[in-house]
């Protein structure tokens, strides 16, 4: 029951510890108004629910991602492997109301909004990374850094997007590098449907 208004971004993480996921997170019944970027970012979350939130005039609704190489960290001496526990999974996104702002420019980069974006990552390891989908991925604006994250495909799995309502000039619901996910009962009503950045699902 929190309210976020006229701020840059809402709830969530923009960094992570490799192989140490966030677990048992509940983000419910919050209100987000007039946010420049995303309302909710679930980065390397597991066993999480995002339900009953109202997001009005936001740059993005709910962003779920397995790994974000450019902002992932390791503990000194930690042995890392792409087989570790860094696969975001078992996440429910349900009964949210999302209205997305017009596309804009943030820090000199084009920002195209989305209602719900569920994505994994293909990492090149210390040399950098491959972005998970389109070249205009709004989350990939930093320069690659050498941070010891091993190369690999970090798939997102077991995410359900259910009974959400999405409107605005944006992409509705996007999946990339995902498996065993489901999308059902959602309502997507977009404006300017003749443009490339206004895809339903």
Predicted regions and their residues:
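Right-handed parallel beta-helix
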Residues: 1-39, 47
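Solenoid scaffold repeats with emphasis on beta-solenoid/beta-helix
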Residues: 2, 20, 24-25, 43, ...
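Long, low-complexity, intrinsically disordered polar/charged segments
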Residues: 9-10, 25, 95, 99, ...
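Short, charged, low-hydrophobicity "junction" segments
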Residues: 33-34, 38-42, 52, 57-81, ...
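Flexible loop/turn segments at secondary-structure boundaries
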Residues: 8, 48, 70-71, 124-125, ...
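Intrinsically disordered, low-complexity Ser/Thr- and acidic-rich flexible linkers and loops
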Residues: 15-19, 67-87, 103-112, 120-155, ...
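Short glycine/acidic-rich loop motifs that flank beta-strands on beta-rich extracellular proteins
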Residues: 6-14, 36-44, 58-66, 86, ...
């Amino acid at each position: 029951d929190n309210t976020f208004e006229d701020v840059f971004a809402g709830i969530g993480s923009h960094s992570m510890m490799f192989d140490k996921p966030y677990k048992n997170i509940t983000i419910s019944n919050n209100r987000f108004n007039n946010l420049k970027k995303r309302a909710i970012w679930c980065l390397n979350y597991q066993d999480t629910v995002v339900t009953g939130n109202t997001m009005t005039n936001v740059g993005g609704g709910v962003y779920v991602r397995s790994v974000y190489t450019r902002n992932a960290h390791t503990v000194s001496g930690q042995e890392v492997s792409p087989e570790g526990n860094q696969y975001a999974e078992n996440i429910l996104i349900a009964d949210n109301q999302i209205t997305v702002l017009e596309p804009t420019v943030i820090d000199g980069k084009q920002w195209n909004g989305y209602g719900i974006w569920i994505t994994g990552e293909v990492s090149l390891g210390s040399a950098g990374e491959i972005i998970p989908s389109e070249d205009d991925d709004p989350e990939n604006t930093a320069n690659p850094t050498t941070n010891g994250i091993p190369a690999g495909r970090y798939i997102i799995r077991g995410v359900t997007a259910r009974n959400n309502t999405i409107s605005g000039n944006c992409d509705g619901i996007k999946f990339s590098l995902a498996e065993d996910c489901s999308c059902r009962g959602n309502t997507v009503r977009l404006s300017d449907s003749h443009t490339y950045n206004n895809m339903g699902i």
